[in-house]
A protein has these predicted regions:
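TPR alpha-solenoid repeat register
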Residues: 197, 231, 265, 299, ...
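Structural marker of alpha-solenoid helical repeat scaffolds
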Residues: 190, 224, 257-258, 292, ...
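Long, contiguous interaction/recruitment modules in multidomain scaffold/adaptor proteins
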Residues: 60-159, 331-333, 404, 408-433
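Canonical tetratricopeptide repeat
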Residues: 200, 234, 268, 302, ...
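Residue-level recognition of tetratricopeptide repeat
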Residues: 160, 169, 194, 203, 228, 237, 262, 271, ...
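A contiguous, surface-exposed recognition patch within enzymatic or periplasmic domains that forms
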Residues: 1-43, 51
Length: 750
């Protein structure tokens, strides 16, 4: 894709290393290499080094001083080094533990150096040391191999309370809230007194603002162990939100016994005393918090506030400087610095605001304002909200706080302004925002308030409440309301909202949503109608184009599909595969039709075309040995068989039969392998393969379907297709298997 790069340096490779053993994917949860999570208010610091490597043709080992590439050429040892520092040191070359040679090394930054050793060391026995262990490269496996377990016990019971809890906790750590709730609830159902699951589930409910659901779980956990640190910490958080001050203080006090939540518990106590203007106790608990985590930023901010409120200006400045020396863009400290200097209005805070440059700056102001409101400082909160300009959620919060201060005229003005704003790019998600919206709805009812409430419920896994809120929205000309609400519905109700959105607004997003709906219900005629309409409106939008092409393919308009794809420019992106998948399917479906009509020469042309990887479709061609062409080869065999060219047919069947399959997952092309084995006279081997599927992949519907087809049981095969296999959604970088052949093979055997 060099022509798509924004530089002219050609192709490049980015090598990555990290703090943990792997870059965890979803399925890492089922290995020892779990997803890591941070403890409340803990600060974790590490250093990452990013640097270029040039002129050494590869990397054998890298460190903070540079990268080394070791090669052997004609019996000699070559050491190429790309330095990051000016060095004047030496390189020691060992055979096992025996020093063989020492070479001088003098470098300038990024000026590659190549050294040649007098003697080549046998592979597996070389060790290279630069300077005083500045970089150590060893080919001896014992220098790297660890004896720690690398696989999960085979008999680990994922359906036990602990197994279900582990799955829930791992989804929680990945921020996949719906799956986390599913597994944690199953763990509690399995064992209603399994404390870790009770605590984790309550933490999820707290995060989602479901306080009434969290409280009974925490009561159960505390009835098992009144000193459970995490349970007490969460019990404190929930009770604090619910206004039960004594309960919250007691809970945080007991939580401080546990090292995992101690720093956070003390800081929470400090906040509560700050809210009561008990500055001495607020300072005491902030200091206690810092004893266990000197970089607890909330505790530092609390001290800044305490010292400012008690007139200890120099101590406040010391705290501010301590943080800014380490984190120059920590906006809470910058705000305290500005407030201390007497800058209390949005105009006066322009210098402060000038460095808040993220894509959603109003979220930074809302986060800071929420903290000041929690510690009883509404003036500071209002000043921060004013910096957010006309962002509706900030205006609703301002209106609420102004009303709390008795400033009803200003409150009403802010509320009217909030209701007048467009909902475009407004994505509220914090549960605590709900109280401002509930209040606003009692003061000045407006459909936008219900829409915002629906978004908050939705993002916090309360889809029924989200739909209730959005259903209360009166008819409006805001298409995004209908698009959003449609995703909370199903069937005809979903389609009705999508059609309402289309009546209100013609946009590619509306068209794409309609195409997704019709695709989901396999209404391919509608896909082609809507696809044709929106492709004319948005000819360069390949998201629309690919959906339209898929519709053409599924309705048998193969030539039109391929023609459309040839005109399309799909930008390559991580995990994308759709463009080439539709192209391949169109050609192979056409080949199947042509074989059925005995047009063998034309069928061969379609099969050959299916093997191409057109660059304009945005999917890179893998290496040949990574391409599964069993379906293409099987169809070719059928063509040659139909033409009476038995030797060519047998050669194709042999290619299919010889493919080695992965033991990790079931691919539907195994059916073709089994059939090919049978075609070349290896019936026993084919039967054994099919029999093994039930044992190796007992829950795989595709495996059961393939076995039914192999055995000629078309009735069972048809029944299995009613519960279609669906690919689990994953992130693009995950090494997940996608069976690209299943739909094609289903069509073949229809």
């Amino acid at each position: 894709w060099e022509d798509l790069l924004t530089d002219t340096d050609g192709q490049y490779i980015e090598l990555q290393s990290g703090r943990v053993f792997n870059q965890p994917a979803s399925n890492s949860a089922y290995t020892p290499y779990k997803h890591y999570a941070f403890a409340p208010q803990m600060t974790d610091e590490w250093t990452e080094y990013w640097y270029p490597v040039k002129g050494i043709q590869g990397v054998s080992k890298a460190s903070r001083i540079g990268a080394l590439h070791v090669t052997r050429e004609a019996g000699s040892l070559k050491l190429a080094f790309s330095p990051l520092e000016v060095l004047s040191t030496d390189v020691k070359i060992y055979q096992d533990e025996k020093l063989v040679e020492t070479l001088p090394l003098n470098t300038k930054v990024l000026e590659p150096v190549t050294l040649s050793a007098a003697k080549s060391i046998p592979e597996g026995h070389l060790k290279v040391v630069i300077g005083d262990d500045l970089l150590v490269y060893s080919e001896n496996a014992k220098d790297y191999d660890l004896e720690r377990p690398m696989t999960l016990p085979e008999d680990f019971d994922w359906n036990s309370a602990y197994g279900l809890y582990t799955q829930g906790e791992q989804w929680l750590n990945q921020k996949v809230w719906d799956k986390a709730e599913l597994y944690l609830k199953q763990a509690v159902d399995k064992d209603s007194y399994f404390a870790p699951a009770l605590v984790r589930l309550s933490s999820l409910y707290y995060r989602e603002g479901r306080y009434a659901e969290a409280l009974p779980l925490l009561n159960t956990a505390l009835s098992l162990n009144t000193y459970d640190g995490e349970a007490n910490y969460l019990y404190g958080l929930v009770n604090r939100v619910m206004g039960k001050t004594a309960e919250a203080k007691a809970a945080f006090s007991i939580a401080s016994f546990a090292a995992s939540v101690r720093t956070a518990a003390y800081e929470q106590l400090g906040e509560m005393y700050a809210c009561e203007k008990n500055w001495a106790k607020a300072e005491h608990y902030a200091q206690k918090s810092l004893e266990f985590n000197e970089m607890n930023l909330d505790a530092r901010q609390l001290l800044m506030l305490v010292y400012r409120q008690t007139g200890k200006t120099e101590q406040a400045k010391e705290q501010i400087q301590y943080v800014l020396d380490r984190l120059p863009l920590y906006h809470a400290a910058r705000f305290e610095e500005a407030w201390l200097a007497g800058k209390h209005t949005a105009d006066q805070l322009k210098d402060f605001s000038s460095l808040i440059r993220n894509e959603l700056p109003f979220e930074t102001y809302l986060e800071l304002a929420g903290w000041y409101e929690r510690v009883g400082c509404p003036d500071e909160a209002l000043a921060l909200l004013a910096c957010a300009g006309k962002y509706p959620i900030a205006l609703y919060q301002s209106a609420y706080l102004l009303s709390q201060q008795g400033k009803e005229t200003e409150s009403k003005a802010a509320l009217e302004q909030a209701n007048a704003q467009s909902p475009d790019f407004v994505f509220p998600f914090r549960p605590e925002t709900m109280k401002y919206l509930d209040w606003a709805q009692t003061q000045s009812p407006n459909w936008k308030i219900d829409y915002y409430k629906g978004l908050i419920y939705w993002t916090n896994q309360q889809k029924d409440k989200a739909l209730e809120a959005m259903n209360r929205c009166t008819p409006t000309d805001y298409a995004e309301l209908y698009l959003s609400r449609a995703q909370l519905k199903s069937g005809q109700a979903r389609l009705d909202d999508l059609l309402k959105a289309e009546q209100v607004e013609t946009s590619w997003r509306v068209g794409f949503a309609l195409l997704n709906y019709y695709t989901s219900v396999s209404d391919w005629q509608k896909v082609t109608e809507v696809g044709k309409k929106y492709t004319k409106l948005y000819p360069k939008n390949y998201y629309i184009g690919l959906k339209y092409a898929n519709g053409l393919c599924e309705t048998g308009q193969y030539a039109a599909c391929v023609s459309l794809l040839k005109k399309m420019e799909v930008l390559p992106n991580e995990g994308s595969y759709a463009g080439r998948a539709v192209y391949r399917a169109a050609n192979l479906y056409q080949a199947m039709d042509l074989i059925g009509k005995r047009k063998y020469a034309s069928a061969l042309k379609s099969i050959e075309a299916s093997k191409e990887w057109p660059e304009n479709l945005g999917v890179g061609k893998p290496y040949d040995d990574q391409i599964d062409s069993r379906l293409e080869d099987y169809l070719e065999a059928k063509v040659y068989d139909g033409q009476g060219q038995q030797e060519k047919a047998k050669a194709c069947f042999n290619r299919v039969a010889e493919v080695k399959t992965s033991p990790k997952y079931f691919e539907s092309a195994r059916l073709l392998t089994a059939l090919a084995l049978r075609e070349v006279g290896k019936q026993i081997e084919a039967d054994a393969m099919v029999t093994s599927w039930a044992k190796d992949f007992p829950d795989s519907k595709p495996a059961q379907w393939c076995a039914a087809i192999y055995k000629g049981d078309t009735t069972k095969a048809s029944e299995l297709l009613k519960s279609r296999y669906s690919q689990q959604d994953t992130t693009p970088w995950e090494a997940t298997y996608r069976d690209t052949n299943f739909d094609l093979i289903v069509r073949l055997f229809k």
